Amino acid sequence: MPQVTMRQMLEAGVHFGHQTRYWNPKMAPYIFGARGKIHIINLEKTVPLFNDAMNFISSVAQKRGTVLFLGTKRSARETIKEEAERCGMPFMNQRWLGGTLTNFRTVKQSVARLKELEAGETDGTFEKLVKHEVLGLRRERDKLEASLGGIKDMNRLPDAIFVIDIGHEDIAIKEAKKLGIPVIAVVDTNYNPELVDYAIPGNDDAIRAVQLYARAAADAVLEGKAAAPHAASVREEEFAEAAAEGEEKPARRAPAKKAAKKGDDAQA
């Protein structure tokens, strides 16, 4: 599991919460105190919860599962994209489209349209069209790429979602809960940690803090993937043995021999 120390969290500003007047009482167990009307998060509470969350992400990846990285607020967009791509997971970093999870079939149709437009750009289809038609198709492609480009290779619903700001991504979290998809999320002092399955009490605004969370999540995915090949090789050996047994069976099929014998008797 990726190791993140309390000192690293302090340096990234993970301990800085929101203004005290905006706090959510459900976060009280994770608040150390206040400084200048800003709540200070107790990192002694954050570290074990952070480790639990990263362990869960790693376990999902080890089982060949998919973790959707989600962060559409400005301070998270670039980091979410970079880290998701680094670990080979889908992401959304521009705007959450309502129904992305609960109406996934329709979303897949939009993704198919995006792939169709991308193919048209490279296979010569666009060259046969007039200029204004090409411009219109490229605008459509760019719009779809911005909203769905990060999930165009996600062929099924994710097994978990990693979220930076639960207030900013409240619609996504509601969809995930409705479908029973586990949510791992950074929860600042102004939100309810009970809304997610794995809450990480911490600053959800500071860029360095966001980078720390996303980098650790990506490392957890990579670690989980690295632990998976042994199980995969065992399954491949089992499939190979089953295939070998299947190839031997047709030569020993008694019914085929009986049918051939009946044919010989008829000729006699």
Swiss-Prot record:
UniProtKB keywords: Ribonucleoprotein, Ribosomal protein
A GO cellular-component term linked to this record: cytosolic small ribosomal subunit
Ribosomal protein recorded as keyword: yes
Chain spans, region Disordered: 233-268
InterPro entries: Ribosomal_uS2 (IPR001865), Ribosomal_uS2_bac/mit/plastid (IPR005706), Ribosomal_uS2_CS (IPR018130), Ribosomal_uS2_flav_dom_sf (IPR023591)
GO molecular function, one term: structural constituent of ribosome
GO biological process: translation
Chain segments annotated as coiled-coil in the UniProt record: none
Disulfide bonds: none
Membership in a protein family: Belongs to the universal ribosomal protein uS2 family.
The protein's name: Small ribosomal subunit protein uS2
Organism of derivation: Stenotrophomonas maltophilia (strain K279a)
